[in-house]
Amino acid sequence: MNGLKLRYLLADLEPVRGKVLDVGCGAGSVAKAVKRERPDLDVAACDVSRSALAIAAASPEGVVFRVAEAEKLPYSDGEFDAVWIFDVLEHVEKPELVLREVARVLRPGGRFHIVLPLEGQPWTLYRFIGCGTRWTAKRRHGGHIQVFSAERFSGLAAFCGLPVTATRWSYHFVLQVLDILYFTWLDWRGPVGGSVEDMAAERAGIAGSVMRAASMTVATLAWGEATLFADLPGGCGHFSCTRG
């Protein structure tokens, strides 16, 4: 799904010129991909994890990396023309503090793009099984301490000066089923120290080949499903916002 997330981000960044920021960049793969696709942009990125940033900074590829908390960004007011966040807000205690900081460092009219799991979205399997209440595997194994719906996020974003202007969707039926099965399996087995993709890449022999083939098949199905149903609500939102 990372390719789809990047595609939607780049579409949002198409009219943007100047300076952009990746908040919660991890090891920097998205920031570097944006810099490769848009070498005209000045790309900055930050994360709270020093170990992840050490990996990112080992080969920065033109991106300026910095250690920072999302709730307290070390940048000037209105410094950026666009900001994006992938899969971060569900992990923080006070998401409104993060959104206020994004609004602060964005110039008026600047673009904000966020990818956010919507495990409280009506008509999803997550909502049906009670994600975050009856079913808490993603809280324990994925650190998802917030459960969002599109309505909750849109209200919070508007309150913080970042009204939503467009929404795309992913994580429809296929990925919801697999996601729930995976975290339920973790509940039964215990932590495995990596994703399914990591395990498939590391496994040798026939078992590894089968896992890699299965992973590719699932990725293809998920991409097709998300592309076909991009305008129908799902378990993940790709929100475009504009700084008021």
Label each region the model flagged.
Residues 72, 90, 155:
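Active-site micro-motifs of SAM-dependent methyltransferase domains
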Residues 86-89, 115:
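Residues lining the SAM
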Residues 1-76, 82-86, 99, 169, ...:
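Conserved N-terminal segment of class I S-adenosyl-L-methionine
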